[in-house]
Amino acid sequence: MSQVDINHARALVYQLLSSLFAREVDEQRLKELTSEAAQQFWEQLSLEAKLTQSVDKIRSTLNGIKDDETLLELAADYCGLFLVGTKHSASPYASLYLSGEDEPLLFGQQHQQMSEFLHQSKLQVQSHFPEPADHLAVMLAYMAHLCCHSEDSVQLSFLQTCVDSWLAKFINQLTQCDKNGFYSAVAILTLAWVKQDIAQLEPAEAVIS
């Protein structure tokens, strides 16, 4: 597999994770996520030992949705966890976890930083997604873009500074609120994937000097 193919595959994983945080799973998305091609994708992802448990939870949840009621329950989980903004939710914005303020504001420093990154890459948050730019879905979508358009050093810096720096805190909050465990599994998978990607992107230490 060429480096171009590897980067494309990495981008697909980031795009998938981004989509799961961007909106609730509807009927059409469920069909896509449980299609034959998707099953092969999940299977391939689960071969990595550190990803297996999270992938299995995600797959079992998606494959277990057989009626509208169960699908609506998953949609309700998404809304309750990410859209309500109470102590029983886990807002997916970097600003809320990286700010030193007691009551951090949305559209803060991390939002401004991400907006600048997007502007430099001639990208923008779509109008149908009216969220601050430091939303996890935006960051993961941007990383998918970087996989195919930027040097490894740029990708590594972005992951370490803008993503890995707060994901663990987000997961800690999310796991306390997520009774059904689907979105916790998605978040844990995201962190494990990011950690693995960072390890791959870090320059190898010289054997001799």
From Swiss-Prot:
Q: What is this protein called?
A: Chaperone protein TorD
Biological process (GO), any one: protein complex oligomerization
A family per Pfam: Nitrate_red_del
| Keywords (A to Z) from UniProt | Chaperone, Cytoplasm
The compartments listed are:
Cytoplasm
The record's section on HAMAP family has: TorD
- Tell me which species this is from: Shewanella baltica (strain OS185)
Q: Name one GO cellular component term.
A: cytoplasm
Q: Which family does it belong to?
A: Belongs to the TorD/DmsD family. TorD subfamily.
| Highest taxon listed in the record's lineage | Bacteria
Q: Is Cell division one of the keywords?
A: no
Q: What is the stated purpose of this protein?
A: Involved in the biogenesis of TorA. Acts on TorA before the insertion of the molybdenum cofactor and, as a result, probably favors a conformation of the apoenzyme that is competent for acquiring the cofactor.
Keyword Iron listed? The answer is no
Q: Which InterPro entries match?
A: Chaperone_TorD, DMSO/NO3_reduct_chaperone, HscB_C_sf, TorD-like_sf, TorD/DmsD_chaperones
